[in-house]
């Protein structure tokens, strides 16, 4: 998919200029962003605060962030706040069937059976919880200092410690296994959520690839993608089929003048668009970066002035959130 301009219809919703393509467009260039539905909102919050994660839940989007913020976001970009008396920063949120679990700093875990009323449950840790993933009705969370949390219902948790050098910053799962990553370039994998193998990417690929600081991992049924930065601050994106052999993707693209350039901006979030068979990165400086199956067809698009932190794709909608609790909505 790309944002290929076909025919545009302009209209106003709630004071926001929105653009809708008459057909289903494709993601190709920054200039063509307006071929998709686009709306952006900001809050009055400070520059350092914002949303940290977002999911699709019950026909709407649910985002979490600093100060315990939990907001529903509609496909038009309007938000509705969920009451939450706990002000810990929430780093991640996940749902399974009707239940919703949000987690974050100092080991906080909030549980909801309906997405409206959230109750604090005992996590058994005071470490920052950074990511969660469901598989086979088992919920696994990753936290600082090698802490793994495990739950069958989202309310009762047990923990174990992994001998890793870094903090577990992200976890994802498919039908086969969980994979997590640390901010020291380590990759952890488990088939049952209890027993984990640990690999040090930086050590194994020393001399072949630059050392990496990992940020997010995303699993689909046949691909695994890790995003982060190299030690020199340049962006890094790794692909694997089974998690055993990793290939770094070249992040080159053609700018609006047709000049070949390389992405220099840090990626923070990732989603998969199955209809377009593309991974889309949410990056600093309001940039989206598309990684289609064609490795020479990457696309750079700037949609905001804010650093983007999280992104999710649901049907025709791409919702991106970031600093200052900004919301960007794109309709393909």
Descriptions of predicted regions:
Residues 1-30:
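Classical Sec-dependent N-terminal signal peptides that target proteins to the secretory pathway
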Residues 23-332:
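Residue-level hotspots at or immediately adjacent to binding/recognition sites across diverse folds
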């Amino acid at each position: 998919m790309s944002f290929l301009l076909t025919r545009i219809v302009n209209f106003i919703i709630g004071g926001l200029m929105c653009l809708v393509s008459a057909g289903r467009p494709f993601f190709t260039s920054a200039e063509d962003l307006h071929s998709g539905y686009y709306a952006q909102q900001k809050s009055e919050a400070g520059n350092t605060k914002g949303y940290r994660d977002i999911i699709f839940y019950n026909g709407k989007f649910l985002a979490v962030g600093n100060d315990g913020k939990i907001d529903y976001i509609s496909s038009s970009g309007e938000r509705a706040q969920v009451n939450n008396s706990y002000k810990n920063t929430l780093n991640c949120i996940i749902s399974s069937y009707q239940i919703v679990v949000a987690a974050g700093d100092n080991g906080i875990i909030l549980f909801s059976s309906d997405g409206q009323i959230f109750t604090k449950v005992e996590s058994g840790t005071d470490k920052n919880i950074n990511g969660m993933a469901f598989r086979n009705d088992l919920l696994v969370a990753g936290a600082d200092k090698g802490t793994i949390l495990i739950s069958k219902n989202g309310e009762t948790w047990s923990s174990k410690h992994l001998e890793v050098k870094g903090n577990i910053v992200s976890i994802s799962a498919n039908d086969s296994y969980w994979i997590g990553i640390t901010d020291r370039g380590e990759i952890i994998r488990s088939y049952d959520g209890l027993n984990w193998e640990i690999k040090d990417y930086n050590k194994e690929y020393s001399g072949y690839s630059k050392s990496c600081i990992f940020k997010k991992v995303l699993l689909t049924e046949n691909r695994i993608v890790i995003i982060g930065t190299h030690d020199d601050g340049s962006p890094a994106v790794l692909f694997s089929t089974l998690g055993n052999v990793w290939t770094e993707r070249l992040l080159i693209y053609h700018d609006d003048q047709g000049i070949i350039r390389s992405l220099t901006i840090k990626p923070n979030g990732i989603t998969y668009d199955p209809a377009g068979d593309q991974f889309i990165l949410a990056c600093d400086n309001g940039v989206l970066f598309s990684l289609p199956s064609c490795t020479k067809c990457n696309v750079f698009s700037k949609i905001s002035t804010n650093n983007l932190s999280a992104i999710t794709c649901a049907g025709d909608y791409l919702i991106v959130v970031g600093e200052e609790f900004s919301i960007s909505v794109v309709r393909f």
